[in-house]
Swiss-Prot record:
Transmembrane segments: none
Keywords: ATP-binding, Cytoplasm, Ligase, Magnesium, Metal-binding, Nucleotide-binding, Purine biosynthesis
A GO CC term attached to the entry: cytoplasm
A GO MF term: phosphoribosylformylglycinamidine synthase activity
Protein name, entry field: Phosphoribosylformylglycinamidine synthase subunit PurL
Broad class of the protein's primary localization: cytoplasm
Residues the entry annotates as binding ATP: 55, 94, 523, 560
SUPFAM superfamilies tied to this protein: PurM C-terminal domain-like (SSF56042), PurM N-terminal domain-like (SSF55326)
Chain positions recorded as Mg(2+) 2 binding sites: 120, 271
PANTHER family tied to this protein: PHOSPHORIBOSYLFORMYLGLYCINAMIDINE SYNTHASE SUBUNIT PURL (PTHR43555:SF1)
């Protein structure tokens, strides 16, 4: 008999609103249970049937992704993906979002986002070795956005620094669409330390279920449902739905869990993240095709008089649920106690496929595991056949809509005056989306663990040194991994399909630019409401683009996160959706980390080369230049030829491994001119560049984006070897791929000539001042 705890008298309409469920959902719940749910059970269904937990709106689209590959050991379905990076080493990685919590409580929202993704990693038996983040905020001319940025960065820094995991890289972008709804996506990587991957499926009927970690409180109750709804002017009232983290307990939890896993006494493990004890128990039961019974009276709590609803939906941080060997339970409890952690047997594995919850001596919930985890509802939406009319109109934009170029100047449609190309370069460098993120990453400890090869900002991707390998020559050789998070949300907003292909291609290109082979991705799909036909079309088109790019580049998807309903409602009830933002977290492997290279020029007189594709379009449409200089967000983003993209990356990687290429940098936001300026700034050296205009406008040549392009340098000492390599590989080149010398590294000035005419002459000091101070000036 199910105890209704006197809450069978609840107001149904009010309860459904709180749990973000529909009347149809309620009728389906009654059908599954063959009775009416009590209030506790309704809360359990509310969180488990939310988009955050069951992907009810996105599941049909996620099935399009390739999930298998030669390096993939664990794909979607577990706490994180796992790949083989060679030398008997396994990399665990995943990305997650904490968007809505960060919007109303930026410090704790971001901090617990870091804590949550770290638990996904070490729950698999891996030691966390790196964190990256992808952040989006509204423009910094609004003080509220400055406050959000300050709070989020402080939260990430606090948790990551205290727990001892380096924050090694990331990206950040600013756009008005994020003003009411910032995005905080965190990616973590870990190196497996156990002989076997620790999985989440419960096994062996009668095995004890062990609760480990922090105590349970009322913080975070309903967090999963909160994360699956839009933000409104009353969202600040939902602050109790934001969790409060303790990185020092997390540090103890990491060490204690890895120690316990190595004993082989832990049969299964699941962290308590979204939906807390409800989700962890249901997923462990479902993944093991068994059931679990939990007695809430045995759960360590920090507050008195908590209801079963609060116990089950609390998202208090730093908590884990284990299935363990019965004969080893005392040893494990003693081990966790030594780390200052609570450890208590709270239940057992049962033979029936149910989650059974007891409280105060009575059963308060009894639900089939399939109803909570395996067989959750799916919302099917119609996909509109054609892009929206406003996008089609933007796609008609042509470069000849811009003012003509007179000598060395062009008229800005945004500021109604002429600018020289040197002034435009400086202006673009001061755009916060392009400018140095030094103010942000200097708050992070990027060097803890002593395996970070390049500090943030020095290279296109983060590079982490792995364990030493024993080679026959007895010299120390370290393998490594590279990671990058990328998305040009402006491109995705203007064409979700092309923009998402570009996000995958750029993340792979960044990994290739350090010399690593891209092998797999995790993604974080940040979109607005799927109930809006344009919002769902954006999501569907984006998934199609990601799937196509991942198949072509052979980088399967190992898992990730979907965050929908990212839109804000103002006091007039007007809804502002975010730019669709499918963040791609790419990982790559290096056999020898000493071969990795950065983006900075190395030596004066090194040759500067450019590789790219004629099939991959290069144009001003959808560019940063068009937005920031002319005030227009329009045009169709460049199309990327994925075969040429793959060839360009492979060709460059091979040259890097042969130690022919000494620096490389992909061309993205701001085009060729900004890529050149960035390498000058990083190295405190100049560059002398000579280009041919052909039929291009000068601004197209300097600021166009796309083209699968990379600039790289060849040491003046290796030029003969380079030309030999180039000649040997020429026969393999597709006719649409080009490699050409465009200049050389010089002392202290960026000089650009086009058709032998001086277009730009800027001292590196001036470039650096604009680049470094743009964001910090707001603080």
């Amino acid at each position: 008999m199910i105890n209704q705890e006197n809450n069978d008298l609840y107001d149904l309409n009010e309860a459904l609103k709180v749990e973000n469920l529909t009347l149809n959902d309620y009728e389906e719940i009654c059908k599954r249970l063959k009775r009416k749910p009590n209030r506790t059970e309704l809360g359990m269904f509310g969180v488990m049937w939310s988009e955050h937990c069951c992907y009810r709106n996105s599941k049909p689209l996620l099935s399009k992704f390739p999930t298998e590959g030669k390096h993939v050991l664990v794909g979607p379905g577990e706490n994180a993906g796992v790949i083989d990076v060679g030398n008997n080493q396994k990399l665990v990685f995943k990305i997650e979002s904490h968007n809505h919590p960060s919007a109303i409580e930026p410090f704790q929202g971001a901090a617990t986002g870091v804590g949550g993704i770290l638990r996904d990693i070490f729950t698999m038996g891996a030691r966390p070795i790196a964190v990256l983040n992808s952040l989006r905020f509204g423009n910094l001319d609004k003080s509220s956005n400055v406050d959000l940025l300050r709070g989020v960065v402080s939260g990430i820094a606090h948790y990551g620094n205290c727990v001892g995991v380096p924050t090694v890289g990331g990206e950040i972008d600013f756009d008005d669409s994020y003003s009411g709804n910032p995005l905080v996506n965190v990616m973590a990587l870990g190196l497996l330390e156990t002989e076997e991957i620790v999985c989440s499926g419960a096994k062996n009927v009668g095995s004890p279920v062990l609760y480990v970690g922090n105590t349970t409180g009322r913080d975070g109750v309903g967090g999963a449902s909160f994360a699956s709804s839009e933000l409104t002017t009353t969202s600040l009232d939902d602050r109790p739905a934001v969790q409060v983290g303790d990185p020092f307990i997390e540090k103890s939890l990491i060490e204690a869990c890895l120690d316990a896993f190595k004993t082989g006494d832990v049969i299964a493990a699941q962290d308590m993240g979204a939906a807390g004890l409800t989700c962890s128990s249901a997923e462990m039961a479902a993944n093991g095709k068994l059931g679990i019974s939990i007695d809430l009276d045995l759960v360590p709590s920090r507050e008195d008089d908590m209801s079963s609803y609060q116990y089950l939906l609390s998202e208090s941080q730093e908590r884990m649920l284990f299935v363990v060997k019965e004969e080893k339970i005392n040893d494990l409890i003693e081990k966790f106690s030594k780390w200052g952690l609570y450890a208590s047997v709270v239940g057992e594995v049962i033979g029936t496929n149910e989650v059974i919850i007891s409280h105060k001596g009575k059963i308060v919930a009894k639900i089939p595991t399939s109803a909570l985890s395996d067989d959750t509802p799916v919302n099917f939406h119609n996909v509109i056949n054609n892009p929206p009319d406003d996008l089609l109109k933007k796609w008609e934009w042509k470069e000849n809509d811009l003012p003509e170029i007179h000598e060395k100047n062009i008229f800005s449609l945004k500021e109604n005056k002429n600018f020289s190309f040197s002034e435009i370069i400086l202006k673009l460098l001061s755009n916060p989306s392009i400018a140095s993120k030094r103010w942000i990453y200097k708050q992070y400890d990027s060097q803890v663990q002593s395996n970070t090869v390049f500090t943030p900002g020095k290279s296109d991707a983060a590079v982490i040194r792995l364990r030493e390998q024993n080679k026959k020559n007895k010299s120390k050789v370290f393998s490594g991994v590279a990671a990058s998070v990328d998305c040009n949300s402006r491109w995705v907003a203007l064409d979700p399909f092309r923009g998402s292909i570009a996000a995958v291609a750029e993340s792979a290109r960044n990994v290739s630019c350090v010399g690593a082979e891209p092998v797999a991705i995790t993604n974080n799909l940040n979109f607005s409401s799927p109930e809006n036909e344009i919002g769902y079309w954006q999501l569907s088109s984006s998934c199609n683009g990601i799937a196509e790019a991942c198949k072509a580049l052979e980088t399967p998807v190992t898992g990730g996160n979907v965050s929908l309903y990212n839109e804000s409602k103002n006091k007039d009830n007007l809804i502002t959706p975010i730019n669709p933002t499918p963040v791609i977290g790419m990982v790559g492997k290096l056999d020898n980390v000493e071969k990795a290279i950065s983006s900075e020029w190395k030596n004066i007189e090194d040759q500067i080369w450019l590789i790219g594709s004629h099939k991959s379009e290069t144009k001003i449409a959808a560019s940063s230049y068009l937005e920031y200089f002319h005030g227009e967000i329009t045009g169709r983003p460049p199309k990327i030829d994925l075969l040429d993209e793959k060839f360009c990356q492979s060709f460059l990687r091979n040259a890097i491994l042969k130690s022919l290429v000494v620096s490389s940098h992909d061309i993205s936001d701001g085009g060729l001119a900004i890529a050149l300026a960035e390498s000058c700034i990083l190295s405190e050296r100049g560059a002398t560049i000579e280009l041919e205009k052909d039929l291009n406008r000068v601004d197209n040549l300097l600021f166009a984006e796309g083209g699968s392009r990379i600039i790289f340098t060849i040491s003046k000492m290796k030029q003969n070897e380079w030309f030999n390599y180039l000649q040997l590989n020429q026969i393999k080149f597709p006719s649409s791929v080009y490699v050409k010398k465009i200049g050389y590294v010089s002392s202290d000035t960026l000089k650009i000539k086009i058709d032998e005419k001086n277009i730009c002459n800027i001292r590196v000091e001036e470039l650096t001042e604009k680049f470094n101070n743009s964001i910090s000036d707001y603080f």
